[in-house]
C-alpha cells in the first residue's frame, strides 16, 4: 500500500489483496468475510415502489432483519449507471445491483438492520431532485433515521452522488461515489462530508483525472481539490482497474462499518426538498 495523493488516507493495491490487508475487529471481520462469498438477496425480495409524487420515480427497497423495538435504521441509497435507465424498475438491479447488494449481504450476515433503496432514472443523468424524491418517499414508508442517510453510486450514478451532495451537503451523512466525475467548481460545501471515493486508474470511460474533459474532472482530481481546501476524503484507486471496479469496491470489508458510523448533526426536513426555486436538470446526457 502506498500514498497516491497528498493527504491522510489514499491507497493503491492489488485487488486480490483487498481482504487480506484489512484489519478489523473480529466480529465484524467474521460477518463480512462470510458475506463476501455468499449472495443472500434475490431480486424478487426487494419491494417495487414508485414515489407518491409528480416525479413517480421507480425504486426497489429492502429492509434487512434485526430491528429492535422502535429503532430507526440507516438508509443506503444506490444510484445506477446510465445503461440501466428506464421505467421498468428492474434494470437497476442487474449484476447484483452492480455489486451494491453486497452491502445488503453484509448487513444480513452481520445481523445489521438497515434499509437499502435502488431508484431508477429515465435520464442518463441523476437530477438531484429525483434522488431527493426517493429519500422523501422512503422516509414515509420505512423506519429510517434521517441522520443516517448515505449515498453511493457507480459511473453516472457516482456522478449523481457528487452532484446531489453539492446540492444538499448538510442532508447526507456520507457519500461513496465510484467511477464518477463532477465539475471542479462548487466543491467547498462538501469538504466536510465524509467520503470514500473509488476509481480505476485505467478507466477508459470516465478518466480518473479528467473525467470527460472540459469542466468535468475525475475522482483523483476531485479528491486532490477537496484535500486542498481541508477535506479528508478516503480514496481507493485500483492500479489495473478499468471502469467497472464496483464489485471490488463493494466487497471492501471496512466499507459498510465505516459508512454506518457516519451521522449528520441535525436531520434535514426532506419534505421541504427541493428548495424553492430549485430547477432540476433535465435532458442532460453525460454520454460522449
Task: Spell out what each predicted region is.
Residues 12, 38-75, 154-159, 164-167, ...:
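A domain-start/cap signature at the N-terminus of enzymes
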Residues 94-107, 130-134, 178-188, 217-222:
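Alpha-helical scaffolding within the catalytic cores
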Residues 141, 147-191:
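Primarily recognizes the serine-hydrolase "nucleophile elbow" in alpha/beta-hydrolase
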Residues 198-207, 212-288:
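C-terminal catalytic histidine-bearing segment of alpha/beta-hydrolase fold enzymes
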Residues 66-71, 124-156, 166:
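Gly/Ser-rich "nucleophile elbow"/oxyanion-hole loop immediately N-terminal to the catalytic nucleophile
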Residues 75, 79-130:
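Active-site machinery of serine-nucleophile hydrolases
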Residues 112, 190-195:
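Short, proline-enriched alpha-helix->beta-strand connector loops that line the catalytic pocket
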Amino acid at each position: 500500500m502506498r500514498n497516491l495523493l497528498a493527504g491522510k488516507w489514499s491507497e493503491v493495491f492489488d485487488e486480490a489483496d483487498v481482504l487480506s490487508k484489512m484489519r478489523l475487529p473480529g466480529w465484524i471481520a467474521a460477518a463480512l468475510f462470510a458475506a463476501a462469498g455468499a449472495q443472500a438477496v434475490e431480486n424478487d425480495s426487494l419491494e417495487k415502489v414508485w414515489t407518491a409524487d409528480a416525479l413517480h420515480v421507480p425504486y426497489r427497497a429492502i429492509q434487512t432483519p434485526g430491528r429492535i423495538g422502535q429503532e430507526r435504521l440507516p438508509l443506503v441509497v444506490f444510484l445506477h449507471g446510465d445503461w440501466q435507465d428506464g421505467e421498468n424498475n428492474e434494470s437497476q438491479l442487474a449484476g447484483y445491483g452492480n455489486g451494491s447488494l453486497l452491502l445488503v449481504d453484509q448487513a444480513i450476515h452481520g445481523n445489521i438492520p438497515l434499509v437499502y433503496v435502488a431508484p431508477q432514472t429515465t435520464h442518463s443523468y441523476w437530477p438531484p431532485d429525483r434522488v431527493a424524491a426517493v429519500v422523501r418517499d422512503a422516509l414515509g414508508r420505512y423506519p429510517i433515521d434521517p441522520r443516517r442517510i448515505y449515498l453511493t453510486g457507480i459511473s453516472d450514478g457516482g456522478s449523481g452522488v457528487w452532484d446531489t451532495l453539492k446540492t444538499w451537503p448538510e442532508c447526507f451523512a456520507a457519500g461513496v461515489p465510484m467511477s464518477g466525475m463532477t465539475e471542479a467548481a462548487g466543491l467547498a460545501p462538501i469538504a466536510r462530508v465524509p467520503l470514500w471515493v473509488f476509481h480505476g486508474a485505467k478507466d477508459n470511460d470516465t478518466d480518473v483525472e479528467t473525467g470527460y474533459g472540459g469542466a468535468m474532472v475525475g475522482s483523483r482530481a476531485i479528491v486532490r481539490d477537496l484535500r486542498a481546501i481541508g477535506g479528508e476524503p478516503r480514496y481507493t484507486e485500483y492500479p489495473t482497474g478499468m471502469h467497472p471496479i464496483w464489485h471490488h469496491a463493494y466487497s471492501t470489508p471496512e466499507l459498510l462499518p465505516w459508512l454506518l458510523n457516519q451521522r449528520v448533526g441535525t436531520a434535514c426536513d426532506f419534505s421541504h426538498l427541493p428548495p424553492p426555486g430549485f430547477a432540476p436538470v433535465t435532458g442532460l446526457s453525460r454520454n460522449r
